[in-house]
């Protein structure tokens, strides 16, 4: 998170907005985790239907999505936390340990899926930071234009921000 926060400041988002939105986003803006929960739950429900013949109706699926929206707010910032929320919620909606068996199928690829969830969560938080800075009228368009170019270090030196200029030169 510190590297992402520094990158958002270098992009032109004020430090006070970065300091509020990024940490808050890691608790409440978990786009990647919600996408995983939605797709995985439908996969497990379809696998359970093939096994038991019991169809999960639209109303039950919508109720399950609402449950995921509530339970995902308590996700910890640790690897593979989403799989535990998936397990707990699926056991509520599916009979006789079918949820656990479905989650067991996903465990084989969860390490890769977790990297994808983390990347989507990070991109969502960075996007939210930029959107809020623009909304507040405090986004620095000039800084964004030179972000990641050699001109960024020159702009930092002219504004007296030696630390950012050094970070640009080192490639951080």
Located regions from the model:
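Internal, well-ordered alpha-helical scaffold/interface segments
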Residues: 2, 6, 19-22, 42
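Selected transmembrane alpha-helices and immediately adjacent juxtamembrane segments
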Residues: 7-10, 142
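Transmembrane alpha-helical segments and their short flanking loops
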Residues: 38-172
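Conserved helix-loop functional segments at active or binding sites
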Residues: 10, 27-30, 50, 92
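Transmembrane alpha-helical segments and their cytosolic interface motifs
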Residues: 32-35
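Short helical (or helix-break) motifs at transmembrane helix termini and adjacent helical loops
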Residues: 1-8, 114, 125
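Membrane-water interface at loop-to-transmembrane-helix junctions
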Residues: 16-30
């Amino acid at each position: 998170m510190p590297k992402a926060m520094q990158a958002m400041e270098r992009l032109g988002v004020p430090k006070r907005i970065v300091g509020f939105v990024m940490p808050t986003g890691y608790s409440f803006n978990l786009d990647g985790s919600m996408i995983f929960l939605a797709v995985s739950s439908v996969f497990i429900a379809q696998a359970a239907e093939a096994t038991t013949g019991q169809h999960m109706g639209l109303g039950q699926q919508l109720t399950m999505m609402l449950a995921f929206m509530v339970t995902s707010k308590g996700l910890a910032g640790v690897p593979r936390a989403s799989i535990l929320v998936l397990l707990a919620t699926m056991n509520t909606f599916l009979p006789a340990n079918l949820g656990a068996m479905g989650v067991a199928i996903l465990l084989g690829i969860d390490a890769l899926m977790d990297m994808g969830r983390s990347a989507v969560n990070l991109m969502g938080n960075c996007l939210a930071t930029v959107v809020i800075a623009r909304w507040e009228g405090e986004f620095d368009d000039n800084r964004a234009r030179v972000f990641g170019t050699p001109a960024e270090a020159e702009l930092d030196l002219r504004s007296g921000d030696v630390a950012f200029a050094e970070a640009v030169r080192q490639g951080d």
